[in-house]
Amino acid sequence: LHADLLPHDRAVGSNRDFLALRHDHNLTRGWTGRLNVQRASDDNYFRDLSTRVVDTSTTNLPRDGELRYGNENWIFSTRVLSYQTLQDPDPTKRIEIPYRLRPQLLLLGNKPGYYGADLNLESELTQFDHPSKTNGQRLLIYPSLSYPMANNFSFVTPKLGYHYTRYKLTDNFSGDSQLTRGMPIFSVDSGL
């Protein structure tokens, strides 16, 4: 926890503060949680009160939370992310507000050595929103199968997978509210 407080700053006529809470926690076997929440009282807080360039150029303060489970074959996580955007005082230099993730669900699977093959799964479901842009949901699924073959002097690993992505959009200005893409992927990794 980090907190700064400047009571009744005469230059602006109000209290000014900055708060940063960062916490990583091992909950139970395989489960972890993480928080990174930051806030500033006003857009000019760092420009007025910091002497470090890294602080004075800060524009987005994260508000990020994640709950994760993992074992030797699976990882599952759920995450929410938004930002406090500190605007430039010059109205011609407005800073674009980033998208919020509410929530982002992730499932990764890996089963090496399954009858000689390695099975993998990457999947993600994300609800993203923005106050003035297209909002929506993205689904990504990428299962793959690879078959590593090696001897003392070389290796060859063919891999076959299918990458599927679906977007379901609202407030979409292009007209299409549902977009999908599926692509088979084949690769070979080899070496001596």
Model-inferred region functions:
Residues L1-L192:
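Outer-membrane beta-barrel proteins and related beta-barrel translocases across Gram-negative bacteria
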